Amino acid sequence: MTMPITVPFVGFTQAELQSFRNASVPDLVGPRLKLLFVGINPGLWTAATQTHFAHPGNRFYPALRLAGIIDRDLDRGRPMTEADRAYFVERGIGITNLVNRATARASELAAAELLAGRTRLEEFVALHQPIVVAIAGVTAYRVAFAVPKATEGEQPVELMGARVWVVPNPSGLNAHQTITSLAQAYAEPAKVAGVIT
């Protein structure tokens, strides 16, 4: 039996990454959506791989694994496989962004883009009807939803019938969080959504 040859994935050059500036990334969503994670916007690595939260330094997938939301490791930095995408859909987990425009840093977004992202998110939630929406990033939430004093955790409002949580951003740039603290924050909305018990 011949074994396939695997070529190590070494990443992207800065020029390659910059070529993905302003690109979009398709939403990961399917029927029977329970828990919708909402990123701020795609990073350049995410746009290059067409995989949400894909930067090698992003702690999203390790935190989901530690929380028991997923039961497999995903190879950060590589494109998500079709089997991985199907696994998320089967679990009732979806991923979208407030703004679907790739930048090197979320701080490159204008406030108007975040406000428009709220409208897009409302339409998305109305269409897909998740039980819980978990928005990853309190600063972006404050701007997009015009709630300047919002804190992380469950919010006192619903979004098109879905309960809303603000959870910490898993970016490696968010030095205040660890994989353990992210896992704890992500487990709470996952329990309410019925993804974990």
What do these predicted regions represent?
Residues 90-147:
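Internal catalytic-core helix/loop-beta-alpha segment
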Residues 41-45, 100-103, 139-141, 170-173:
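Short, solvent-exposed loop/turn segments at secondary-structure junctions
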Residues 46-112:
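Short, surface-exposed acidic-centric catalytic microdomains
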Residues 33-35, 92-93, 162-163:
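Structural motif
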Residues 30-40:
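Short, hydrophobic/glycine-enriched beta-strand segments
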Residues 47, 63, 143-144, 176:
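Residues that scaffold the ATP/ADP-binding catalytic core of kinase and kinase-like folds
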Residues 1-26, 30-31, 55-56, 105-120, ...:
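C-terminal capping/extension of enzyme domains
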